[in-house]
Amino acid sequence: MHFFWSTGLRSSSARRLLQLKRFQSTKATTSKDNKTLFTYGKDGHYFLDRIDPTESKFSKILIANRGEIACRIIRTCRAMDIKTVAVHSDVDSHSLFVKMADEAICIGPAQARLSYLNEDIILEAVKKTGAEAVHPGYGFLSENTKFAKKLADNNVEFIGPSSKSIQDMGDKIHSKVIARKANVSMIPGYDGEVKDEVECVRVSNDIGYPVMIKASAGGGGKGMRVAWNDKEARENFLLSKSEAASSFGDDRMLVEKFIDNPRHIEFQVLGDKHGNIIYLNERECSIQRRNQKVIEEAPSVFLDKETRRKMGEEAVQLANAVGYYSAGTVEFMVDSKRNFYFLEMNTRLQVEHPITEATTGVDLVHQMIRVAKGHKLRFKQEDIGVRGWSIECRVYAEDPYKSFGLPSIGRLTSYKDPSDIPNVRCDSGITEGSEISLYYDPLICKLTTFGKDRQAALATMAQALDSYVIRGVTNNIPLLRDIITEQRFVSGDISTKYLPQVYPEGFKGKQLKDTERESLLALAACIAVKSAIRDRSFKQSTKGMAPKNYGYEVKLGDFKRHIRVTPTEKDGVKLFEVDMDGKQIIKIDDSFKLGDHVININFNGQPFIMQLFKMDAIGNVTLIYLGTKYELRVLPERAAKYMPIMPEKKQLDLASVLISPMPGIVKSVSVKVGQRVTDGQEVCVVEAMKMQNKLTTGRAGVIKNIRIKEGETVEDGKILIELE
């Protein structure tokens, strides 16, 4: 976790040592061209933001959040020599953030509304522990006006903006009125609340399709849907309204013009209680699925200096209009001509804040805490530059082959992040053995890289993703790894429609060339040889000399080669000479072990990195290459001769059953046994991580059997409904 410090610093003396180190090490070094140089990653990178040990501070802060953001806040608190209190649900009792905090209190069961969203029980924890301030992180109560006011009424500092600012900007209907008065560029739309689906259709026709239907209190992509016609307006209004009530406890809806194919660019603002406010430049957040960000970067390849200045100044205008202080983010839609339109303001720390920290040298959590204590900002707008490039990939427990990422659950049986690679930062709240549950966001890690330019940051990201070991849960690394080398992304030609445009049939995994397939086959054969040699050494009764070479038929789908592997050694260096169908020889380093998750070797002298996901005793070898998992079959030559006569396994008729594409909770079932249905008709809704997913039939027919009921928890792959 690796972000800058060890997770074991609980003693005050250790914290003071860390604080002094941070204070002393923040003098920036400069090169001959006066560009600031720093190393990003474990050792810290806040060259513009020293911690002053003589400055007044809170003695104890309660963190009203969980997971990676709680860990992130604890780290800065440690550097400031501030004690921390973690509040947690019962299922989080063994989580990393609980272990990292100085104190921890259980506040209820797994359901967020009974624990992390329970304002009164969190306030009780504040009183019990004597915490002077509360940091809400992001999500949960971070933009809850009532919670911020309750804390103020109890003389507890809310580490964020005032409750009035939260109210003004949190209500997306009211925020648009304020933004228009502040001369901020606006999207055409309807300024009032849309009460029901009938009014939604009327307003949508007045604005003109397509429209965006969104929750007034929404965020994180929840409660948002696009409608292209009256039918979609009715359906999506009801789904979004239900989702908003479930996620935010507020089902008010608004409708605005949908700008097709825009960029999503946001500006970080930071203000104090003395009227000083600045912008810390932009973050490009256009790579999204279901209106949720997947990859972010700073700066944006699209903005020129003048557009950056105009957008930043409008963000500050809006913040000034509501007397804003603390960290906040103003989000804009930007069209192809660099026209920009206000979207919303998030009155909290953003998930993607690390990329801003990397390119500005500012610790946003440190500044939020300082501002809450009443201190002035120590830097002005002219101090904020753009230094280098930073990219963040959100590593989720999701299946990227299903709608670019439907949630996955399970236990992390093996886990090693790539934080040992220079210029890599891993913000995570999990360790090996952690459980990814249905109840919370499926984020595993925010993987962030830094470089002198975009190309360098992307190269480091590729290495980091290739080296990231995650076992036990399905994850979205295959999609992330493919995106960062895809031609359009590399050129900077992106928009919020990037994923459906680049992958119109959905993500299918890395598409390999024949030479890449042959490399996989060759390595799988070498793994089989190492396994055979190991097995032979364990069998004491084995007689005779070991074979000089090993012959196999290796298959990857329909692609196969006959391979002969000869182990050799020259000048103390062990090699495998791999004969591929008698046409070419590949030399592969014999420097890896069968127990290695990550295999860094040379193919004909060129560096090559793969992961060995699993292997078994009957020749099945699963490799991970460029993020994608490949299942190979390695058979000795004699065994391969008998495979054509083996019986094939009978396949399930998928057109006659509806299978849950993810783990979740059944919110509704809209059909009955014996009912005739059409192709594509909605039959049920399954909710996971507060996102509602409408499931439809794959063909016309009659409902034969319904295996579920409302409120039931279902697993990924469970048969829900059968058709005759």
Question: What is each model feature region?
Answer:
Residues 59, 222, 299, 441-447, ...:
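Short amphipathic alpha-helical segments
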Residues 450-456, 461-473, 647-661, 665, ...:
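Conserved bacterial/organellar gene-expression machines centered on ribosome-associated P-loop NTPases
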Residues 84, 133, 142-150, 392, ...:
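Structured, non-catalytic alpha/beta "coupling" segments that mediate domain-domain communication
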Residues 379-387, 499-503, 507, 629-660:
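Long, charged amphipathic helices and adjacent flexible linkers at domain junctions
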Residues 649-724:
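Structured functional modules or segments
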Residues 315, 354-588, 682, 716, ...:
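Catalytic cores of soluble metabolic enzymes centered on carboxylation/carboxyl-transfer
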Residues 2-330, 334-353:
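N-terminal beta-alpha lobe that positions the nucleotide/phosphoryl donor
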